[in-house]
Amino acid sequence: MTTETRSLYSQLPAIDRLLRDSSFLSLRDTYGHTRVVELLRQMLDEAREVIRDSQTLPAWCENWAQEVDARLTKEAQSALRPVINLTGTVLHTNLGRALQAEAAVEAVAQAMRSPVTLEYDLDDAGRGHRDRALAQLLCRITGAEDACIVNNNAAAVLLMLAATASGKEVVVSRGELVEIGGAFRIPDVMRQAGCTLHEVGTTNRTHANDYRQAVNENTALLMKVHTSNYSIQGFTKAIDEAELVALGKELDVPVVTDLGSGSLVDLSQYGLPKEPMPQELIAAGVSLVSFSGDKLLGGPQAGIIVGKKEMIARLQSHPLKRALRADKMTLAALEATLRLYLHPEALSEKLPTLRLLTRSAEVIQIQAQRLQAPLAAHYGAEFAVQVMPCLSQIGSGSLPVDRLPSAALTFTPHDGRGSHLESLAARWRELPVPMIGRIYDGRLWLDLRCLEDEQRFLEMLLK
């Protein structure tokens, strides 16, 4: 060991001496004596490695307290951090899908702070059913006889098939054998549920007679799957639920539908593309309809099944139901969200998902123009900051081919180097409230469709 190396090692402080420093008092109060000591030991080991490998001290050795504070602050951050979604995808699966209405947030907070009547009947002073209140709401909204709630729509499909078709065949059109994110495939779910898939028709065309010829003594269900995350166009033919229900009645086979995204209102009244609604399928005679709570419905992650009382009873009594049931926070948020649908005239203001989807391109354009000047002044030395038209998407497999006119702030490096865009995007991801945009066509795009808090936006970007 050289004299210089020995000198560097000798400059490393003792932990006891560091802890006596006044700058460590608040750190010990905030993070605890044990964790601070543990980190200091780790940092001393790191410093010794740096000395051994590069014959120098780490830069942070000049201020140990500052480095400890920085590391512990980062460590204390929640893994689920709030971000500003400027990707242009409203229901972004990776960013948590639907924002919750204030009423839902308050309901969840109350359910977390206090005992609640989750499975307690106040009238009878006895055990109740956790789905009962929501089932009544869902029946009122959809016209169904009964309802069942589980933790997501994949679980809803699994339960629906396991409880009604295990050991039997389920007839599905080849054009509806969907795969959604995470490699969730209808054929795989059927195998897990103990069903046998009976494919009929072709990818682009399926006729009523295809279903008719497939039905045999072992057929349990005729199933429709809404292809919410892709579209087949051109020379196509599909059987709608009303026609399939008529066939099912003739053959004494019930019809079920996996609706996927599941809107409870006619979106066309807001100028958006129309999606099939559970109440339409219930009116058509479908026995069971499953859909998601956190997509177009705008609530928490949940799987909702509505339909005929006798079939819902089979779902409720199946062993899987307990494994898949929703917890009190989910039920509280979902109930509060569903109650908003009882007052449709205020829905587009009180339901964040609908509010964001219905923002006009003109309003977003004005917002972008208002924000462009301060950002250009701050970033103009390196980037051209412009207002550009763009197209938002709904996301989460909803209305996959439809786009919503929007406006974005774009950042283009003056030197044309893509690495500068990557660096800027990385800097924004490191902000106290990370900013998530997208890089496309030599620009960094910030689609403002989902931006409602302009003050926080500017506070972050002008740091």
From Swiss-Prot:
<dbReference type="GO" id="GO:0004125">
    <property type="term" value="F:L-seryl-tRNA(Sec) selenium transferase activity"/>
</dbReference>
<dbReference type="InterPro" id="IPR004534">
    <property type="entry name" value="SelA_trans"/>
</dbReference>
<dbReference type="Pfam" id="PF03841">
    <property type="entry name" value="SelA"/>
</dbReference>
<dbReference type="GO" id="GO:0005737">
    <property type="term" value="C:cytoplasm"/>
</dbReference>
<dbReference type="Pfam" id="PF12390">
    <property type="entry name" value="Se-cys_synth_N"/>
</dbReference>
<protein>
    <recommendedName>
        <fullName>L-seryl-tRNA(Sec) selenium transferase</fullName>
        <ecNumber>2.9.1.1</ecNumber>
    </recommendedName>
</protein>
<keyword id="KW-0648">Protein biosynthesis</keyword>
<dbReference type="GO" id="GO:0001717">
    <property type="term" value="P:conversion of seryl-tRNAsec to selenocys-tRNAsec"/>
</dbReference>
<comment type="similarity">
    <text>Belongs to the SelA family.</text>
</comment>
<dbReference type="InterPro" id="IPR015424">
    <property type="entry name" value="PyrdxlP-dep_Trfase"/>
</dbReference>
<dbReference type="GO" id="GO:0001514">
    <property type="term" value="P:selenocysteine incorporation"/>
</dbReference>
<dbReference type="InterPro" id="IPR025862">
    <property type="entry name" value="SelA_trans_N_dom"/>
</dbReference>
<comment type="function">
    <text>Converts seryl-tRNA(Sec) to selenocysteinyl-tRNA(Sec) required for selenoprotein biosynthesis.</text>
</comment>
<keyword id="KW-0711">Selenium</keyword>
<feature type="modified residue" description="N6-(pyridoxal phosphate)lysine">
    <location>
        <position position="295"/>
    </location>
</feature>
<dbReference type="InterPro" id="IPR018319">
    <property type="entry name" value="SelA-like"/>
</dbReference>
<keyword id="KW-0663">Pyridoxal phosphate</keyword>
<keyword id="KW-0808">Transferase</keyword>
<dbReference type="InterPro" id="IPR015421">
    <property type="entry name" value="PyrdxlP-dep_Trfase_major"/>
</dbReference>
<comment type="subunit">
    <text>Homodecamer; pentamer of dimers. Binds only one seryl-tRNA(Sec) per dimer.</text>
</comment>
<comment type="pathway">
    <text>Aminoacyl-tRNA biosynthesis; selenocysteinyl-tRNA(Sec) biosynthesis; selenocysteinyl-tRNA(Sec) from L-seryl-tRNA(Sec) (bacterial route): step 1/1.</text>
</comment>
<keyword id="KW-0963">Cytoplasm</keyword>
